[in-house]
């Protein structure tokens, strides 16, 4: 007889061996995602060995996300952007610890090229220290570059928040001095484009194109500059260069 289940997430048959007096679980499981009746496997033996399938069901449970604790790491974590590529973890730590107690600092590097991605994070020991770092360092110049410093406010998600991406798109400043950037890796953000292209000229704005209504990258973007000279310099220097492990295409938009 078929058996019906309610709110079943998966059916996980577990194989037990009857070769000894005690059952020995072999840990073979099969996930079944279906609301339809499933045939009972109990009492089924294979011909080659005395193996029995004993199905059991796992019911669904809901977990509510915990509210962000002001003292959590996310509230104490500071984003530091537009830093020179030469800045190391040690140098960034020295810069930050002048304004508060530091728990850890990490400069982010491209996993393929090994080059700095021009930004990093500093986790402070208190929210007050994190706020002090933002107040004292945001807008400061480090080796000729104006750095951007702000509280991350929430843990870095595996996929960007859609409302944030839509806001970024609406904030894009168009210009006749614009380049198209193609063959972008799915992980590339507008900040990465800004950091990369600012090496070759004054970047006005940048954006990564997204599939409408989603956070999924379409694999291309745009960068605007303040002059035609900057456009030409960016194309010559960055066309076919590596970004997040992929060769990008750069040409006039």
UniProtKB/Swiss-Prot annotation:
Component of the chloroplast ribosome (chloro-ribosome), a dedicated translation machinery responsible for the synthesis of chloroplast genome-encoded proteins, including proteins of the transcription and translation machinery and components of the photosynthetic apparatus. May have a role in the recruitment of stored chloroplast mRNAs for active protein synthesis. Bind single strand DNA (ssDNA) and RNA in vitro. Exhibits RNA chaperone activity. Negatively regulates resistance responses to abiotic stresses during seed germination (e.g. Expressed constitutively in roots, stems, flower buds, flowers and leaves. It comes from the Eukaryota. Its main location: plastid. It comes from Arabidopsis thaliana. It is found in: Plastid, Chloroplast. Belongs to the chloroplast-specific ribosomal protein cS22 family. Gene3D superfamilies: 3.30.70.330. Keywords: Chaperone, Chloroplast, DNA-binding, Plastid, Repeat, Ribonucleoprotein, Ribosomal protein, RNA-binding, rRNA-binding, Stress response, Transit peptide. SUPFAM superfamilies: RNA-binding domain, RBD. Coiled coil: none annotated. GO terms for cellular component: chloroplast; chloroplast envelope; chloroplast stroma; chloroplast thylakoid membrane; cytosol; ribonucleoprotein complex; ribosome; thylakoid. Disruption phenotype: No detectable effects on ribosome biogenesis and translation in normal conditions. Better seedling growth under salt stress conditions. Residues 76-154, 177-253 form the RRM domain. One of its GO terms (molecular function) is single-stranded DNA binding. Component of the chloroplast small ribosomal subunit (SSU). Mature 70S chloroplast ribosomes of higher plants consist of a small (30S) and a large (50S) subunit. The 30S small subunit contains 1 molecule of ribosomal RNA (16S rRNA) and 24 different proteins. The 50S large subunit contains 3 rRNA molecules (23S, 5S and 4.5S rRNA) and 33 different proteins. InterPro entries: Euk_RNA-bind_prot (IPR050502), Nucleotide-bd_a/b_plait_sf (IPR012677), RBD_domain_sf (IPR035979), RRM_dom (IPR000504). This is Small ribosomal subunit protein cS22. GO terms for biological process: negative regulation of response to salt stress; negative regulation of response to water deprivation; regulation of seed germination; regulation of seedling development; response to cold; response to salt stress; response to water deprivation. Pfam families: RRM_1. Residues 1-56 form a transit peptide. Induction: Down-regulated under cold, salt and dehydration stress conditions.
């Amino acid at each position: 007889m078929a058996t019906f289940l309610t709110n079943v997430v998966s059916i996980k048959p577990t194989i037990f061996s009857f070769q000894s007096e005690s059952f020995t679980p072999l840990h073979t499981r099969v996930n079944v995602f279906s609301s339809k009746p499933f045939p009972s496997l109990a009492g089924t033996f294979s011909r080659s060995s005395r193996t029995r399938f004993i199905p059991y069901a796992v019911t669904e449970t809901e977990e509510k996300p915990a509210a962000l604790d002001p003292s959590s790491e996310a509230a104490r974590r500071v984003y530091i952007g537009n830093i020179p590529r030469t800045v190391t973890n040690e140098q960034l730590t020295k810069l930050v610890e002048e304004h508060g107690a530091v728990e850890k600092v990490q400069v982010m590097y491209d996993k393929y090229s090994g080059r700095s991605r021009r930004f990093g994070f500093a986790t402070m020991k208190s929210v007050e220290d994190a706020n002090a770092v933002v107040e004292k360092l945001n807008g400061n110049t480090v080796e000729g570059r104006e750095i951007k410093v702000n509280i991350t406010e929430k843990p870095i998600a595996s996929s960007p928040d859609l409302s944030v991406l839509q806001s970024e798109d609406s904030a894009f400043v168009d210009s006749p001095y614009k380049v198209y950037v193609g063959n972008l890796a799915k992980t590339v953000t507008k900040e990465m484009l800004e950091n990369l292209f600012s090496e070759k000229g004054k970047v006005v704005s940048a954006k990564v194109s997204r599939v409408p209504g989603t956070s999924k990258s379409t694999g291309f973007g745009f960068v605007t500059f303040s002059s035609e000279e900057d456009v030409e310099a960016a194309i010559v220097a960055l066309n076919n260069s590596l970004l997040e492990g992929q060769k990008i295409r750069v040409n006039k938009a």
